Amino acid sequence: MALAVLVSAITVSNDGPCDIFARGGTPCVAAHSTTRAMYAVYSGPLYSVRRRLDNATMDIPAVAPGGPANASVVDAYCEGAALGCTIAVIYDQSGHGNHLRAGPGRRGHVDLEVNATADPHTLLGRKVYSAYFEPVDMYPGAPHPKEVGVGYRNDNTTGVAKGDEPETLYAVMSGTHYNNGCCFDYGNAETGIFDAGDGTMEAISITADQRGTMHGSHHGAGPGPWVFGDLEQGLFVGNNSWPAPSLRDADNNTFSFVTAMIKGDGASPAAPLGHWAIKGGDATAAAGLRTLYDGPRPCAGKPPACINKGNQSWSPMRKFGGLILGIGGDNSHG
C-alpha cells in the first residue's frame, strides 16, 4: 500500500510514480498532485480551483493523459478575478476516492485553502502550479491560528492502512519552503482533529525543527531541513537517538525539491519494536534518493519496557487511516 503526493515536481518519466509502485506490488491507495498525473494513463481531473469572487469551482485536468497539469485553464478561470483563486480539492488519482478538501477547524471554522497561483513552475515545458502553503497570519481576516490551519484532510478513506498494517508514503516537496516546527504533514492521521496518542499517525514532515522532538528523540545532524516521520506525540528522524543527515548537497545548499519516503512495517516476534525506514534526497536528480534511516521504531523507554504499553509506545502502531496535507493530525501547524 502506498500514499503519494507531489506538491511540486520538475521532472517526469514515461511511467507515473504510481505505475512504478504498482509494479513493485504496492499500488497507490491515494495519489495527489497539482502538478502532474501520477499514472501514465490517468486522464481525470488533478485538482479543483475556487474563485474567491463568486465561490465557483473549476476542475483542472492534465494537458494529456499522464502529463503535467494544464495551468492555462487555471489562468483563464482565475486571471482578473477579484482576490484570485484557491485550491478547493486535490483529487485522488488512485480510484479509491480519497480526495483532499479543507479540513474542519475549531469552534465551527474550516481550515484555509491555499492560493492556487502563488507558486508557478515549469514541467516538461509547461507551466504548472504547486500547492503553496503559507502561515495562517498571511491570510487577512482569518480566524486565530489556534482555531484554523492551512491544510486538507479526509477522515473517511478507503484502503488506507490502519492499526499496525504496513504502508509506504512518498512525497515531492519544496526543499527551500518549510517550517521549523510541527506540523506540516502528508500521510496517515487520526480521523478527526484530536491527538489520539503515540503511534496513531504515520506521516511525512519536512522541517528544520532545531528543538529536537518530543519524548527525547533526536533531530538530524547539521542545519537541516530533515525528513521526519510524524508518528504522533513526536517527530522522528529514526529512533530515539539517530542523527539523520540534512537534505543538502555537497556544497551545503538545500535541494530545490525534495523526495521523501517513509516505509513502515508492523511489529513481529523478530522485530518487537517494529521496523521503519526513511529515504530522502534531491528530487531533480536521477540518483538523488538515499536511505536516511532503516531500523526499529522509536521507543518510550528501554526495551522491553516500551513494548505494548498503549499510549506510551510507537510499536505496535495504532493508525486510524485518515489523510492529511499541510497540518498535523489534531490540526496543529507550525
Give the residues covered by each predicted segment.
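Fungal secretory targeting signals
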Residues: M1-A9
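GGW-centered surface loops in extracellular recognition modules
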Residues: I10-V110, Y170
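Short, hydrophobic/proline-enriched secondary-structure or compact coil segments at domain edges
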Residues: V41-A56, Y129-F133, A171-V172, W276, ...
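Extracellular structured ligand-interaction cores
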Residues: G44-L46, A82-I90, G95-G97, R126-V128, ...
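Extracellular glycan-recognition modules
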Residues: G95-N252, A267-A270, T284-L292, P298, ...
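Short beta-strand segments enriched in hydrophobic/aromatic residues
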Residues: G175, I262-G264, G329
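Loop/turn-rich, solvent-exposed surfaces of beta-rich toroidal or solenoidal domains
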Residues: F257-T259, D265-D282
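Flexible glycan-contacting loops in extracellular carbohydrate-active proteins
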Residues: A287, L292-H333
